[in-house]
C-alpha cells in the first residue's frame, strides 16, 4: 500500500477523500476493532515496537537503528523482527547482509541487519523466539503496530514533523492505517522527527491523551561528501521530499529530483536515464541508503554507476539526550513487571 499512496492523501481533504469516506469508514471499523480488541501473544523478552500511524515513510528505519545501537551500548544483544516489505520470503529467514538481496528480503531489513540480527517472518512470535535462541535479549519490532501479532511492552509511534498524518483520513480516503483515536489508545509515546508544523494535530492529540512526546532530527553522517556540490537526487521511498531536504541540510544544492515509488525495483532504463540527465547538467547523483542497498544487490547494475553514486547516510538524534535511554529503561521495566506480575 505504501508504494501506491496517492498524493491527495497528504493534502487537505478534497472530493476524493469525501467520495471514499464510506469505504474508509468500513476499513476504519475493522482495523480499529482489531487493534483495540486484540490480545497479542507474548514472548519472554522485552519488546519495543517502532511503528507509525500511516502508510508511507516516517523515519522508522533510522529510529530502529538508533535503538539497536543504544541497546548494544548498554551491553544488550538486540534482535529485530520484521515482515520484510518488498521481499519474497514467506517463512522464517535470518537476514544475511553479505549474501541476501533486497528483492528477496526487502531493503529495510538489509539496512537493519548491519546493526543487529534481523529475523523475517509473517509470524512475529516465531521470529522473536528464533532471535532468542540466537542469544538476543531485547526485541525491536520494525512496524507491526497495527497487526497485533506480537505483544509490545512499549509502542513508540513515529511521525514526520512536516508531513504529519496527511489529511487525517483512514485508508482508502487517506493514509491512516486505523482511526487515530484507536491507534492513540495503544500508543505509549510519540516521536516527532524533523522540523515543521504538519504534525501539530497529532501532537496535540497525544498530549491530550497523556502520551509522552519526544522530538528528534535526522543528521547526515556524510556531509563532507555532500556539501558544496550540485546534485540530481533520486529516491524510491515513502517520503522522498524528506530525503531531498536532508541533502540540502547537509549543504548540497539539489538541482534536479526524481521520485520513484516506495521500494521501487530499478530497471536498466531508469539507471541510463538518471546517468544521462546528470551528465547533461554536470550534476552528481545521490540517493538514499535504502535505494542504494536495492541497487547494490540488483543483478546487472554497472559497477561504475555504483562507484560514482553518492549515498546520504543519516543518523537519528534525539533533542533530549536522555530520551533513548529513558525509553529503553521503560521497555525493560515493563517487561520485568509483566514477567513477575
Swiss-Prot record:
Pfam families for this protein: LpxK
Record-listed ATP binding positions: 54-61
GO annotations of cellular component type: plasma membrane
Molecular function GO terms recorded: ATP binding; tetraacyldisaccharide 4'-kinase activity
GO terms for biological process, alphabetical: lipid A biosynthetic process; lipopolysaccharide core region biosynthetic process
Enzyme kind, highest EC tier: transferase
InterPro entries reported for this sequence: LpxK, P-loop_NTPase
Top-level division of the source organism's lineage: Bacteria
UniProt KW keywords: ATP-binding, Kinase, Lipid A biosynthesis, Lipid biosynthesis, Lipid metabolism, Nucleotide-binding, Transferase
EC number(s) on file: 2.7.1.130
Reaction it catalyzes: a lipid A disaccharide + ATP = a lipid IVA + ADP + H(+)
Pathway: Glycolipid biosynthesis; lipid IV(A) biosynthesis; lipid IV(A) from (3R)-3-hydroxytetradecanoyl-[acyl-carrier-protein] and UDP-N-acetyl-alpha-D-glucosamine: step 6/6
Family: Belongs to the LpxK family.
Record's function text: Transfers the gamma-phosphate of ATP to the 4'-position of a tetraacyldisaccharide 1-phosphate intermediate (termed DS-1-P) to form tetraacyldisaccharide 1,4'-bis-phosphate (lipid IVA).
Protein's UniProt name: Tetraacyldisaccharide 4'-kinase
Gene name of this polypeptide: lpxK
Amino acid at each position: 500500500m505504501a508504494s501506491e499512496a496517492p498524493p491527495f492523501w497528504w493534502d487537505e481533504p478534497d472530493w476524493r477523500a469525501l467520495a471514499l469516506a464510506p469505504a474508509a469508514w468500513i476499513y476504519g471499523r475493522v482495523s480499529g476493532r482489531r487493534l483495540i480488541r486484540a490480545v497479542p501473544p507474548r514472548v519472554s523478552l522485552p519488546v519495543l515496537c517502532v511503528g507509525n500511524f500511516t502508510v508511507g515513510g516516517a523515519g522508522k528505519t533510522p529510529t530502529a537503528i538508533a535503538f539497536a545501537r543504544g541497546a548494544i551500548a548498554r551491553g544488550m544483544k538486540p534482535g529485530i523482527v520484521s515482515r520484510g516489505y518488498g521481499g519474497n520470503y514467506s517463512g522464517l529467514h535470518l537476514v544475511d547482509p553479505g549474501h541476501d538481496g533486497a528483492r528477496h528480503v526487502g531493503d529495510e531489513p538489509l539496512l537493519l541487519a548491519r546493526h543487529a540480527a534481523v529475523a523475517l517472518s509473517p509470524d512475529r512470535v516465531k521470529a522473536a523466539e528464533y532471535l532468542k535462541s540466537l542469544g538476543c535479549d531485547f526485541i525491536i519490532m520494525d512496524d507491526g503496530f497495527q497487526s497485533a501479532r506480537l505483544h509490545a511492552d512499549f509502542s513508540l509511534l513515529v511521525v514526520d514533523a512536516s508531513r504529519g498524518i496527511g489529511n487525517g483520513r483512514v485508508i482508502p480516503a487517506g493514509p491512516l492505517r486505523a482511526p487515530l483515536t484507536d491507534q492513540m489508545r495503544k500508543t505509549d509515546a510519540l516521536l516527532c522527527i524533523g522540523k515543521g508544523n504538519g504534525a501539530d494535530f497529532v501532537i496535540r492529540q497525544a498530549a491530550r491523551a497523556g502520551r509522552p512526546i519526544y522530538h528528534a532530527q535526522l543528521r547526515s553522517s556524510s556531509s563532507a561528501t555532500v556539501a558544496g556540490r550540485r546534485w540530481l537526487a533520486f529516491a524510491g521511498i515513502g517520503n522522498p521530499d524528506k530525503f531531498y531536504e536532508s541533502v540540502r541540510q547537509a549543504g548540497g544544492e539539489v538541482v534536479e529530483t526524481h521520485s520513484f515509488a516506495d521500494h521501487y525495483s530499478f530497471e536498466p532504463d531508469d539507471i541510463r536515464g538518471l546517468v544521462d540527465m546528470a551528465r547533461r547538467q554536470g550534476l552528481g547523483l545521490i540517493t538514499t541508503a535504502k535505494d542504494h542497498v536495492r541497487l547494490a544487490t540488483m543483478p546487472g547494475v554497472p559497477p561504475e554507476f555504483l562507484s560514482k553514486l553518492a549515498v546520504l547516510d543519516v543518523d537519528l538524534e534525539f533533542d533530549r539526550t536522555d530520551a533513548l535511554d529513558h525509553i529503553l529503561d521503560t521497555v525493560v521495566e515493563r517487561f520485568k513487571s509483566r514477567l513477575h506480575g
